[in-house]
Amino acid sequence: MPVIKVRENESFDVALRRFKRSCEKAGILAEVRSREFYEKPTTIRKRENATRAKRHAKRVARENARNTRLY
């Protein structure tokens, strides 16, 4: 849990912005969204494999684009 100490003469908006940023860095909202509904382990594995495959395809496409000549 991110803890923010409000500095002297610091406005509420600035302190709230700092708190939101620290929550974002800690990944709290992403964790809450992922745990909102139960997801079967097979579904989790399937989703992770799909993201891995997409990332790999993107990397290969970048490599191929770098190796092709533009003339």
Curated annotation (Swiss-Prot):
Gene Ontology molecular function: any one: structural constituent of ribosome
Alphabetically ordered keywords of this record: Ribonucleoprotein, Ribosomal protein
Gene3D superfamilies with a match to the protein in the record: Ribosomal protein S8
Region (Disordered) residue spans: 47-71
InterPro entries noted in UniProt: Ribosomal_bS21 (IPR001911), Ribosomal_bS21_CS (IPR018278), Ribosomal_bS21_sf (IPR038380)
GO cellular component: ribonucleoprotein complex; ribosome
Extent of Basic and acidic residues compositional bias: 60-71
UniProt protein name: Small ribosomal subunit protein bS21
Protein's organism: Pasteurella multocida (strain Pm70)
